[in-house]
Amino acid sequence: MVSITLKTNRIFRSCLNLATNLKFSITLFIIICIVSAIGTIIPQDKPKEFYMNTYSLKVLGMPLWKIIQLLSLEKIFYSNFYLILLLCLSFSLFFCSLKSQFPYLRTSRIIKLNNNNPPTSPLHESKKIKYNNIASKNDSSCVQLVSQGYKIYTFDKNLDKAGPLLIHLSLILILLGSAIHAFNDFIAQEMIPIYEVSHIQNVISSGRISKIPQTISLKASAFTVEHENEKVVKQFITNLAMLNSKGEVLKQGLVSVNHPLVYKQVYIFQMDWKLFGIRVNYGKNKIYEFPVQKIEANNEQQWSCTIPAKNQSKLILIFKNMSDEFYVYDNNQNFLKIGKINTPQLIRNTYFTVISKISGTGLQIKKDSSINIVYTGFLLLIIGLVINHKGSKKRT
């Protein structure tokens, strides 16, 4: 039993020495940087078909997309390997702080002032004194002279010593926040038609223990577009409400790209929009809904809709962006006229009115439970760097 205990202690000390080794921490940091760079080069969380089409090149007789999936490079920031690296670096910084930074901060800088020629009556008590020639060199440092026999030391209790410790602590918080994000958070995208209620279903990425809120639903009551001019879109804005299972409003507000709706660490951003169809009135309250198809032309978002006309003919309506105007063509793609929403049209003996467009808002829903931890880490990192820089200038 004693030998087993000794071996266990040796193994523990070896692991502790390795964790507090500066070269080990730097090696881990370099590996994390390389892995993160790979994650930025290879698109993350894409459908399988995307990787099959993009990485069809064969390497050593195997398609590259299979190698990517085999090594989990398509979700590298959620892989076990990446999480283990983050945790190892966090533990390394933590134990290094306990072993080196705290004792360094506690003992401060020690300077031996006298070692020879012992005085006739040596001092035996510690005294805090104002020593002008020392204090002038150390600015606001608290200088304490301590006698020990015939030897006199100064303890320079300086705030500059806290810089490296704050940097270590900030890095630990940032890494811890990243690990929590990888385990507990999720990202989803939803395209919600206006006036309809939708649940969070289209999950793009999620952590191992993350839970998708099934009791929360989303309802978009309005969607508008702000323009800088007639052709340039400034931003999209959605009037969005979060509902509980009983249909009661939990939170409501305007959502845009830079102004999310936040509820219990769930952030909802405006991402995109889509046109689903149009409503057409043929008179006498005969209202029909027709789907639209998206087409690309001249770097503009356009939608095409075919509606029936008299004499078994058809009319083609083209909508551009979010404009209230539409272009009318016949079966042979001959341009007929420009119409407007809520304005009656009489074309080829067909009387109709386009009442409204059925649009939808594209939202990105993400849970970010570690954002406060990460922000605190970056704040401490800035403070630590400022203190460390100030201390280095003093010493020079």
Curated annotation (Swiss-Prot):
Q: Where in the cell is it found?
A: Plastid, Chloroplast thylakoid membrane
- Identify the main location: plastid
Task: Give the residue spans that cross the bilayer.
Answer: 22-42, 79-99, 162-182
Q: Which domain of life is it from?
A: Eukaryota
The Gene Ontology biological process terms listed for this entry are: cytochrome complex assembly
Q: Which UniProt keywords apply?
A: Chloroplast, Cytochrome c-type biogenesis, Membrane, Plastid, Thylakoid, Transmembrane, Transmembrane helix
**What cellular-component terms does GO give this entry?**
chloroplast thylakoid membrane
How would you summarize the oligomeric state and partners of this protein? May interact with CcsA.
Put simply, this protein is called Cytochrome c biogenesis protein Ccs1
**Source organism (scientific name):** Cyanidium caldarium (Red alga)
Gene behind the chain: ccs1
